Amino acid sequence: ADSVGFAYRGDNSKVTVHKQRTCASELLDRIEVPQTATQLLVHVRDYTKGHPRVLPNNHPIRHGAVVGIHNGTIANDDELFAAHGIARAEPCMTVDSELIFALAEQFRGRTAHALERLVGSMATAWLDEGREELLLARGMGRPLWIGTSTQELFFASTRAALDVVEEYSSLKLRKREVREGSVLVVNGGRIVGRDSFRPDMSFEERPL
């Protein structure tokens, strides 16, 4: 891994972010989340664009009020930043994933439609200080799984990761893969809203 990080939100709208350039096991040794936290994002990054030496390039990424994580590659991020007249959150940033969260902020409540313009692969999640829900979205090329219990919802890139959560939490999870072209709105451990979009299926991802 090139970097690891987490973000959480507690009993107010503020999202707290921590990231570091270590392996995942070192993050687990240091991770501290208050008991008041109700939403948590965790990410392990193998970078493709946006060097990890530049800390804002690493996940979770903040753009304005939106903090998110992304698995995949966005090929037309520079083009869409220019087309929408959106500036990078920080001038040093070059990471492609930032575009997703810039669109989430600019098109709050209409993000699914904006995601149709992305060319690339995507499984993503974000928290928005302008709204109380967690947002999950899947484009093409990257898996996204959710596991639900009576009061909790977990998400991960693989079913195996949810199996680990199930084992260590002693919860019984109902696991299912999110369909491509889906946006899920999560609050209080429940899916409270859904939207859909048509991903651009022309993208061919090259192996790292």
Model-predicted segments: where are they?
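Conserved short alpha-helical segments that host acidic/polar catalytic motifs at enzyme active sites
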Residues: 1-208
